[in-house]
């Protein structure tokens, strides 16, 4: 792996926490996907419970991403899913977990956020 800049992607949609690091040629350097837990017999998750689970999963996923050989110091951009649909007013609380993490990382390492 050469020293090109990498991209960090974060998604906290309703039923899965995802974090990935990719190279500009599409090579996947790191890929984390973890389904949220739904209690047996339940039909789904309330937004508050899903948000809580994302907040619990993101630190470990991001720590593992940055500990992957060759990643630290090479993130050139951060991307995040910020809402369920690309229309004005589209909102679900679960997306705030990923958006908060992505904004914090992008600001702290001085890279663009998409």
Task: Identify what each model region corresponds to.
Residues 1-114:
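Short acidic/glycine-rich loops and adjacent helix/strand connectors
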């Amino acid at each position: 792996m050469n020293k090109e800049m990498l991209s960090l992607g974060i998604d906290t949609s309703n039923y899965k926490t995802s974090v990935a690091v990719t190279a500009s040629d599409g090579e996947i350097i790191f890929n984390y996907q973890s389904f949220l837990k739904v209690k047996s017999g339940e039909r789904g998750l309330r937004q508050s419970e899903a948000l809580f689970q994302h907040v619990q999963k993101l630190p470990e996923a991001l720590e593992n991403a940055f500990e992957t050989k060759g990643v630290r110091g090479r993130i050139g951009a951060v991307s995040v899913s910020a809402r369920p649909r690309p229309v004005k007013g589209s909102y679900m609380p679960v997306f705030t977990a990923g958006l908060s993490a992505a904004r914090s990382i992008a600001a702290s390492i001085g890279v663009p956020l998409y």
